[in-house]
Amino acid sequence: MCGIVGYVGRQEAATILLDGLERLEYRGYDSAGIAVCGDGVLRLCKKKGRVAALRELTHDGGDLPGTLGIGHTRWATHGEPNDVNAHPHMSQSGKFAVVHNGIIENFITLKEELQQKGYVFQSETDTEVVAQLLDYYYSDCGDFFEAMNRLLHAVDGAYALGIICADYPDRLVAARKDAPLLLGFGDGENFIASDVTALIRHTRDIAYMDDGELAILSRSGIRVYDRQLRPVEKKHHHVDWEVDAAEKGGYAHFMLKEIMEQPAAIRKATAARIQGGRVVLQDLTMTPEQIRAMGRIYIVACGSSYHVGMVGKYNLERMLRRSVEVCLASEFRYADPIVGEGDLVIVINQSGETLDTMAALREAKKRGARILSIVNVVGSSIARESDDVLYTWAGPEIAVATTKAYSTQMAVLNLLGLYFGEVMGTVDYETYTAMVRDILALPEKLEQVLAQADQIQQIAKDFAGRDDVFFIGRNLDYALSLEGSLKLKEISYIHSEAYASGELKHGTISLIEEGTPVIALSTYGPLFDKAMSNVVEVQARGARVLALTTETHREAMLARTDRVLTVPDVEPMLLPQLGVAPLQLLAYYIALERGCDIDKPRNLAKSVTVE
């Protein structure tokens, strides 16, 4: 949710902090600020609104000289969005500045204790308690490191902390518990950040902090300690993303760029994992014996990743002839799930840091289940805590609304199904070879789908003024409709719902009236006739229908409605891989017509790292 960046080195810190914060904007925020230590003095500037306003206010950082600093983009949890509640927060003495992502659960008790000791609070936030409490401990012991140790034993809850002290002009201190934070290693300079995108211009060598760790950064190096203050050797990861992968590259929005990157992203996620016509998952450590002995299979995810899981449920059940349960991570962790030794939990997550998903993973692991994660970010928390990891290799995804991460997750999940199916002997040769053939052809076929962008942009004009849009579909099309509906509502702010077509008569059809926009998905060939009957049904109530079907059924659908989008014919289980692109483009162009902030929709964050 919130974004953190910190720097210690030889360069002007403010310049690096502002650049890092701009690269963290996609995570969502309502205010931003930086604090810099120069000449033994902490200087701070923070403001409600965009980082651009902060940049202007500080004259591109020139008003805050110094080579040590921290920055923050805030997503309000305690206290309304305003200048005072924005981070960083300073201690009463002016010695400490703190940035924080997470929630300090016992902050009210701590605040009352500090007020009794004479501390006066300026904000409504839980974070200011950290600054004041650290100041209190430091005034008692006189040592930054010891004061930090006391602080971490006093606070309860989740936190990623970046802290600087006026008395230590070459020290940046960081701590992590249940909130993501990474370290960046440079030459005569070092960094902290919530996300690698903030650092990619400055370093490719990073390490992810683990829960309970404390890091002390200086120009010369980084020292990391565990909860018992024992030194920890961190594994370095080299980031192979190109700098321009986190730039718009001539596109109006990151979302459009990332939609158009999907053919290449799917090719990267799949091509190296298919050799000689067979799926080869060399990064999977499960033995054939373990695969055949699997008990229950769960897919656990949130948001769009959950919709990938819905598609995966249909496809895995077909390929494995086993029941697969799909669970929302936020529900799974509290549901007392029936999961244990021998069961497989497939965790799907883009960032590898989503709190609910991480908590569900830990709950399943505690009960003895094997964890296989499908994630994008190498070395992320979910990846590190899983028994097996299949990376999607999608590269950085900056727009809040996911596109290429969704597509690559689905591609990897299909490969996993084929691999398991071959080992278990449950997928027939004809289906297996057709799937492999069409997976390799997906990038080219997806490019054909994306070529309909101009047509979709024209259709979007008719939707832009609507208050409600309904999606309907059966089977795989229903799973796909959930994602189409989510994309539309999250970036265009139009109310949208997705319904299983067979449920229309059970209440939904009462919402259909003259002119109601209905997007009918009918790509799944075996159920095309039933899908057509549902189109007729809603048209009889006055619905204005946009249909999405395959090229094979285009003419039949045109007999019922003049607004038809098509996808090439492929093996039916792969149709959602093609069908999602027109829905993404439709949502994008509708939002564009409505003048919405497409890359950073209101009230949304890219990575949800608090409850």
Which residue ranges define each predicted feature?
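Glycine-rich phosphate-binding loops that contact phosphosugars or nucleotide phosphates
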Residues: E289-A441, L521-P526, K530-L565, L586
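Glycine-rich oxoanion-binding loops at beta->alpha junctions
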Residues: T67, G71-V84, Q275-E289, G312-I348, ...
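Conserved short alpha-helical segments that host acidic/polar catalytic motifs at enzyme active sites
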Residues: M1-K248, A252-H253, E261-R296, Y334, ...
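Generic C-terminus detector
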Residues: R544, V570-E611
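Hydrophobic alpha-helical scaffolding
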Residues: Y7-R10, H100, V120, Y137-C141, ...
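Active-site phosphate/pyrophosphate-binding segments
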Residues: Q262-I266, T270-Y298, D388-P517, A591-E611
